[in-house]
Each structure stands twice: as structure tokens, then as C-alpha cells.
UniProtKB/Swiss-Prot annotation:
InterPro entries linked to this entry: 6-hairpin_glycosidase_sf, 6hp_glycosidase-like_sf, Ssp411, Ssp411-like_TRX, Thioredoxin-like_sf
Function noted in UniProt: May play a role in fertility regulation.
Annotated organism of origin: Homo sapiens
Protein name: Spermatogenesis-associated protein 20
Nucleotide-binding in keyword set: no
Phylogenetic classification of the source organism: Eukaryota, Metazoa, Chordata, Craniata, Vertebrata
Superkingdom field: Eukaryota
Disulphide connectivity of cysteines: none
Main location: secreted
Length: 786
């Protein structure tokens, strides 16, 4: 919308405070650029004011955040700032005292959130300014994604990007007029310090308040128009073939041939893109583009797994790579990355049969089970990037994960027998993983000099090349490296651990249920499926209100590992319902326990009541009541680090239609896809997960029915055959012969399907017709993957 953009450009009167973004999950140009402030506003603000300095003896007096449950809010509970949580008390105070609201949004494992808390929010003078001249509100973006999305939309629309911490100044009516990300405490030659920002906004609020209010209203009006997503006068979604090809072309243009991935730096894991490429390969596998799509996805996954973005010692993946080579990561570990990447590597194994990918998937889930799992079955949110190198020292990014040559030599001094030259286990490991005496981290990736002389493990050579270099057997090298990594892992346990965000989110737990269910099904490992089952039980026991049928967004780890909730509870958002429903559908297909399918249908009904836009189509991110007062009610239109909840919902609706035959689900899916038509036509690469749903909707969904006893060996053999083949556009149904069962009541045709000669029997049904009965898993595989 050019008119809105033009207006937004006119109100940007602040000089740019820096060249890049604050620490952002969507990306930033480098660690160095992360440090620059991004500012957008309607307030003129010259650079070069007086700096401010943190107090050397901050008083440990708690503010009202001490009563919150969020780990992020509790990190600010001893700031000399009169913080309020998001809520009516803060809004009433702002209106009564006619003060602007200072809104600061972040999350507990955010590196630059820690920096700003230490540099600015612990500063006594800044604390007085924030407490006396503003109503200061602190928000955990993971608790309130609706608040985060609304004001991030403003920051991104009025500046060069966004990130966290996000700092926005609002009118008492919650309309934004100044926004930015990380601010340094002091002014620099090209950067505006936070104290200067506060003083200038205070001055402008006193002298030019009416102008600020008018500008704020115009910006809000422009954002409302710009964020409109609606069916309009369109009757149907666009052609899937056209949108698919355009999406592939856009990805192909940005693909890194050498290292994989789709950007220079920083490089983020992109599971939604990889899933799209796998689906594109399946529908174009006899074409050159199809082969290329598969190669792009598999190469990216292999380079990521070999790079430093993967924790080779403790498993799991870090948040993103600061360089093109996937070498030096931002060391934070997020639950949603582990969940989605486990699925991506499992799919890669389905496609390729290469156990390299299944081993990576198993490693991810091993990490989650060990480090991100609550004893009752739920999953924690994240581990921080920062930790003290030694107890009592100041935290540094990556300290827990990096190694010096001296450390490795001391831990692995054993000689390697049979090598063509004198060699220790440590030297073998350092050669394979690229460790050097000077450290293997470029100064450009370490602007603060915290990682000098340190090494990030990254695979430099194949096992075959390392073995050949020293005249060793490949399996012997594999054993030696695995043994060495285990010793490093045991030694690492004695280091101070990074902060664990033990908050549990329904949405991310739903993704993790999918991660365990899909991987367990593909690999035929009931142990992994049991983790998914326990996760679903946790969601139902601790994050579901039976009386209202609603999900809760959050719960927290209390003393002794107990599960606690905020009072009042934080109710679920669209993504909580969409991701949990997906997890339950995946769990049903993995376990064939119909109770999970029944719960998924009930949650989908609740989602429709709370979030569906009956006029424009698609789902709003938040309930109307919960988001009351916010200037925007948005529909998420981008598949990023997490898939858009609308994209996931489109898939869920298709699958629910396949499981039940109810036409309403299909009609809703078509309406949703139609509402996002323009976005998919223009920039399909922004919605690859929704483009997959569009393709699935315009193809024929397969209903694969297995008639048999759930626990029988022949039934399990047919089920495992289905899971071994990559078939994204299908539902797997178990028909146990009970006419009163849930699925038999939903799909009457199941009663017409019979077991052949009292054996478990498979039918592949599409377009209201079923294949001949099949009892041989090999024959079924041929039919599913000709």
C-alpha cells in the first residue's frame, strides 16, 4: 500500500541511530550490527547527548514484577524502574496522569535484552526517568504474542527492521508513536543513547503532544489498511501450480549453492522452506526443477548438521548462524527450532534413506528429552546463549559451548593405535572438527572479543577423509570421535549452565508433540511416540480448561518441579490451538489412539469460535476480548521461524476433512486460502507453508485405511510401511471393525472395508474410490511410491 508507506516515511523524523537491527529471531546482519539501535518515530531527536552510567551499587528492592511468573519479567523484578505488567492498571494510570506509556518487549533468553537490562534498566537515573515521566510496561513476547505482533508491525513498517528487545512509546490509548529495538545507554557518533531518547520524548510530549497524537492516529490508520487480509470479491484461491512454481523460483534465486540456505548472513534454520521443497519435489520429481528442489533441501540440512549451528557435543541446534558457512552460531537454543528440525530431518530420511539424517533427528530429540523436558511430560521454552565461563564471572555468549585446544588435549590425551603418525584422540577430534590453537572464530564474528582463542566444533572433513589422512578404518574413526565427544559432554557438565526458560507454551509444546510423533513414526520407535503421548497428556492435564474448552497459553515450573499458572490464566492464542491440533493429528497417525483425534476436533471447533473472521475469512491471531484496546487485530501472514498459524490451520482443516468427511472443514480451508490469495500471488516465498496447503487443497488427499487390530504385528507392519514413505497429502486411518468407534461414526464407508483372509488389510482411497485390498507391505509401498 504505497499511500500508507509514503505517510509512514513522512513521520520518520528521527535520524537513523545505527546501521542494523537489535537481536532478532528473524535476522540481523551480524553480531556487530546487532548492537546498533533502530529507531522510528515522529519525534525529532538529535544525536550526541549526555551519556548515562549504571549505578555501581544498585539497590535490591523488588518492583511489582516480583509477583509475575514469567522468567523474563522476573529478570527485571529488581530494576530501579516502576515496571507494570501489561494490563488495565498501567493503562488507567497513563490516562489518569496523562503520561506516555513506555512498552518494552523481550524474552528471557534474548542476548540483547540482557544487555539493555544491564546497561539501562539497572541505571538509577534512567530508572527515575522511566518511573516519573512514563508508565513503564514490561511484556514477555512469548506470553503475549498478540502485543508483540501489533507493535512489531509498527516498528517494522516505520524502520529498517525489527527485533528484540523491542521498545515502543504509546499514547495512553495504546497507539504507538515512537519505536525502536536495542538502545545503547550512551550517545555515540552515530547512535542515539537511551537517556537522550527518553529526554527528547519527554520534551516532545510536553510541548507537541497534539502533533504526536495526530501522527500516531495517522500511522495507526495506515497500518490498519496495510494489514487488511480479506476474501474481498474473490471467489476462489489462486492456481496452486502457478503459485508453487513462483515460490520455487524465488527460493532458487536466493539459494546458496556452496553452503545451502537462502541468505548470506545471518542464516536461520528454515524448516517451512525445506518442507515446501520436499513437497515440490514430490509433485515434480520427474522434472529438473523437482530434482533441484530435493537437492537444495538435502544439501542445506547436511551443511547445517555439519556446521557449528549444531551442538556436536550435546546435540540440538542453536538459533542461527552469524556467517554464511553455518559456523559461528548465536548460541541460544529454542524449543520450536528443535521441534521443526526433527521433522525436517525425519522427512529427509524418508526421501533419501540416508541414516545421516535420521541420526540428526534422533540427536535433536535426545537433547530435548535431556535438557528441555519437564518430568510430567511438558517441554520448556529455551536455553540462553549466555553463561559465565567460570562460576562468579560475568556471563558471555557461547561460553558453555566453545573449547580451547588446551582443554581438548587435556581431556583426550590417549594415543590412537594404528595411525600412520603419532596421534592422540584429541588431535584426531580437533582435526575433524577444525579446532586451532588461535581459535577458529573470526574477529568479525566476535566484535566484543569474548571468544578469542576459542573454537566452535564444525565438521571439516568427512569420516572417510579423516580416516584416510591418518591411515585408519572409518568405523574406528567414528568410534573414536563419538567417544571423544562424550568425554567433552561429561566435562561440559561441570561448567556453569546457561539460563533455562522453564516456561511452557502450549503452541511450542504442540510443535514438540509433532516432532516426537512424526520422528517416532518414521523411524518406527515407540519410545519417541511415548514422549509425544506424554506431551499431549501434559497439555490436556495442565494447559486445558475443561469447563470452557479453552487452551491456556502458558504454565510455569514452580518449586520442586511443580506446575503453576498465572492468576488469572493467560489464555491461548491462535497459534496455541493451531499447533496443538497439528500435534494431536500427528500423534493420532503415529499411535492410532482415536482419543487424540477427538480432542483435536474439539479444539478446532473452539478455535473457529474464538478466532475465525466470518466476514473476511482466515483467523485472527487473538481473541477479540483478549486483545481489547490494541490498535490492530492482526492475521499472521508470514511463515518465519515458526509457521504462520493460518498456514498450519489450513493444513489442519484439510486433514480434519479427510478424517471426518465434514464439508465445513474444506469450505473453511478454501475461504482461508482465498483470503490470503494476494499475498501468495505476490510473495509466495513469505508463505511457503500456506503454499503447501494450497497445493494439497487442489490435489486429491489420500485416505490410507488400515483394517486391523491396533496391536497386531501385521497391522503394525502396514502402518510402518505408510510412515516410511514421504506422503505429505494424506491421512492415515485405523479401522478396527468396531462400528461404534469414533472414526466409523464419522466415515460410514469404513464399515464397507474388510480384512482379506483375516489379515490386516490396507486400502488407499481418493476421489471417493478405494484401491484393491493389500496385505503385503511391499505391495503397499509400491502403490504409495510408484
Amino acid at each position: 500500500m504505497l499511500g500508507a508507506r509514503a505517510w509512514l516515511g513522512r513521520v520518520l523524523l528521527l535520524p537513523r541511530a545505527g546501521a542494523g537491527l537489535a537481536a532478532s529471531r528473524r535476522g540481523s546482519s551480524s553480531r556487530d550490527k546487532d548492537r546498533s539501535a533502530t529507531v522510528s518515530s515522529s519525534v525529532p531527536m538529535p544525536a550526541g547527548g549526555k551519556g548515562s552510567h549504571p549505578s555501581s551499587t544498585p539497590q535490591r528492592v523488588p518492583n511489582r514484577l516480583i509477583h509475575e511468573k514469567s522468567p523474563y519479567l522476573l529478570q527485571h523484578a529488581y530494576n530501579p524502574v516502576d515496571w507494570y505488567p501489561w494490563g488495565q492498571e498501567a493503562f488507567d494510570k497513563a490516562r489518569k496522569e496523562n503520561k506516555p506509556i513506555f512498552l518494552s518487549v523481550g524474552y528471557s533468553t534474548c542476548h540483547w535484552c540482557h544487555m539493555m537490562e544491564e546497561e539501562s534498566f539497572q541505571n538509577e537515573e534512567i530508572g527515575r526517568l522511566l518511573s516519573e515521566d512514563f508508565v513503564s510496561v514490561k511484556v514477555d513476547r512469548e506470553e503475549r504474542p498478540d502485543v508483540d505482533k501489533v507493535y512489531m508491525t509498527f516498528v517494522q513498517a516505520t524502520s529498517s527492521g525489527g527485533g528484540w528487545p523491542m521498545n515502543v512509546w504509546l499514547t495512553p490509548n495504546l497507539q504507538p508513536f515512537v519505536g525502536g529495538t536495542y538502545f545503547p545507554p550512551e550517545d555515540g557518533l552515530t547512535r542515539v543513547g537511551f537517556r537522550t531518547v527518553l529526554l527528547r520524548i519527554r520534551e516532545q510530549w510536553k510541548q507537541n503532544k497534539n502533533t504526536l497524537l495526530e501522527n500516531s492516529q495517522r500511522v495507526t490508520t495506515a497500518l490498519l489498511a496495510r494489514s487488511e487480509i480479506s476474501v474481498g470479491d474473490r471467489q476462489l484461491p489462486p492456481s496452486a501450480a502457478t503459485v508453487n512454481n513462483r515460490c520455487f523460483q524465488q527460493l532458487d534465486e536466493g539459494y546458496d549453492e556452496e553452503y545451502g540456505g537462502f541468505a548470506e548472513a545471518p542464516k536461520f534454520p528454515t524448516p517451512v522452506i525445506l518442507s515446501f521443497l520436499f513437497s515440490y519435489w514430490l509433485s515434480h520429481r520427474l522434472t529438473q526443477d523437482g530434482s533441484r528442489a530435493q537437492q537444495m533441501a538435502l544439501h542445506t540440512l547436511k551443511m547445517m548438521a555439519n556446521g557449528g549451528i549444531r551442538d556436536h557435543v550435546g546435540q540440538g541446534f542453536h538459533r542461527y548462524s552469524t556467517d554464511r558457512q553455518w559456523h559461528v552460531p548465536h548460541f541460544e537454543k529454542m524449543l520450536y527450532d528443535q521441534a521443526q528440525l526433527a521433522v525436517a530431518y525425519s522427512q529427509a530420511f524418508q526421501l533419501s534413506g540416508d541414516e545421516f539424517y535420521s541420526d540428526v533427528a534422533k540427536g535433536i530429540l535426545q537433547y530435548v528429552a535431556r535438557s528441555l523436558s519437564h518430568r510430567s511430560g511438558g517441554f520448556y521454552s529455551a536455553e540462553d546463549a549466555d553463561s559465565p565461563p567460570e562460576r562468579g564471572q560475568r556471563p558471555k555468549e557461547g561460553a558453555y559451548y566453545v573449547w580451547t585446544v588446551k582443554e581438548v588435549q587435556q581431556l583426550l590425551p590417549e594415543p590412537v593405535l594404528g595411525a600412520t603418525e603419532p596421534l592422540t584422540s584429541g588431535q584426531l577430534l580437533m582435526k575433524h572438527y577444525g579446532l586451532t590453537e588461535a581459535g577458529n572464530i573470526s574477529p568479525s564474528q566476535d566484535p566484543k572479543g569474548e571468544l578469542q582463542g576459542q573454537n566452535v566444533l564444525t565438521v571439516r572433513y568427512s569420516l572417510e577423509l579423516t580416516a584416510a589422512r591418518f591411515g585408519l578404518d572409518v568405523e574406528a574413526v567414528r568410534t573414536l570421535l563419538n567417544s571423544g565427544l562424550e568425554k567433552l559432554f561429561q566435562a561440559r557438565k561441570h561448567r556453569p549452565k546457561p539460563h533455562l526458560d522453564s516456561k511452557m507454551l502450549a503452541a511450542w509444546n504442540g510443535l514438540m508433540v509433532s516432532g516426537y510423533a512424526v520422528t517416532g513414526a518414521v523411524l518406527g520407535q515407540d519410545r519417541l511416540i511415548n514422549y509425544a503421548t506424554n506431551g499431549a497428556k501434559f497439555l490436556k492435564r495442565h494447559m486445558f480448561d475443561v469447563a470452557s474448552g479453552r487452551l491456556m497459553r502458558t504454565c510455569y515450573t514452580g518449586p520442586g518441579g511443580t506446575v503453576e499458572h498465572s492468576n488469572p490464566p493467560c489464555w491461548g492464542f491462535l497459534e496455541d490451538y493451531a499447533f496443538v491440533v497439528r500435534g494431536l493429528l500427528d500423534l493420532y497417525e503415529a499411535s492410532q489412539e482415536s482419543a487424540w483425534l477427538e480432542w483435536a476436533l474439539r479444539l478446532q471447533d473452539t478455535q473457529d469460535k474464538l478466532f475465525w473472521d466470518s466476514q473476511g475469512g482466515g483467523y485472527f491471531c487473538s481473541e477479540a476480548e483478549l486483545g481489547a484496546g490494541l490498535p490492530l487485530r492482526l492475521k499472521d501472514d508470514q511463515d518465519g521461524a515458526e509457521p504462520s498459524a493460518n498456514s498450519v490451520s489450513a493444513h489442519n482443516l484439510l486433514r480434519l476433512h479427510g478424517f471426518t468427511g465434514h464439508k465445513d472443514w474444506m469450505d473453511k480451508c478454501v475461504c482461508l486460502l482465498t483470503a490470503f490469495s494476494e499475498r501468495m500471488r505476490r510473495v509466495p516465498v513469505a508463505l511457503p507453508e500456506m503454499v503447501r496447503a494450497l497445493s494439497a487443497q487442489q490435489q486429491t488427499l489420500k485416505q490410507i485405511v488400515i483394517c486391523g487390530d491396533r496391536q497386531a504385528k501385521d497391522t503394525k507392519a502396514l502402518v510402518q510401511c505408510v510412515h516410511s514413505v514421504y506422503i505429505p497429502n494424506k491421512v492415515l486411518i485405523l479401522a478396527d471393525g468396531d462400528p461404534s468407534s469414533f472414526l466409523s461414526r464419522q466415515l460410514p464407508f469404513l464399515s464397507t472395508l474388510r480384512r482379506l483372509e483375516d489379515q490386516a488389510t490396507a486400502y488407499v482411497c481418493e476421489n471417493q474410490a478405494c484401491s484393491v485390498p493389500i496385505t503385503d507391505p511391499c505391495e503397499l509401498r509400491k502403490l504409495l511410491h510408484p
